[in-house]
């Protein structure tokens, strides 16, 4: 199913020392702020619905547009998120997407002269630095939705950061072969 594909892809970036990984920055933190060796990605990138986050990293429309349509699908401006490349669903949280049991509400509703922000366009938590998306999207890639975030100073994120993946090495090799005029090798 689409959810299975999305979840398998997301696991590549959340599983320590995955078979897909060639080089990773290791984080030995057990998810507890006090033990150190963690990082703040979950706090800095997660949608504000998850309390204590600041939504500092959000995908832009240009980034979203890079995800093409799957074979057999055409772009529909009334349903722009249907039929996208599977990686889109793992990497980008958009209005109506499911994340950690929560349906993302990232839109404005106008009633007469009143404009009401969706739940995920509202600042949450105690954070003075809390923010919300300015692009209409939140980051899904690399973010561990099971990570509990409860304070601004948290360095409790524990997932490793993949610098180089096996799939990237294969694509790099194919590109080099193509540029050297070895098109058959590149396509093999």
State each model region's role:
Residues 1-122:
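An aromatic- and glycine-enriched ligand-binding surface/loop that stacks and positions planar moieties
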Residues 62, 66-68, 142-143, 156, ...:
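Extracellular/surface-associated beta-sandwich interaction domains
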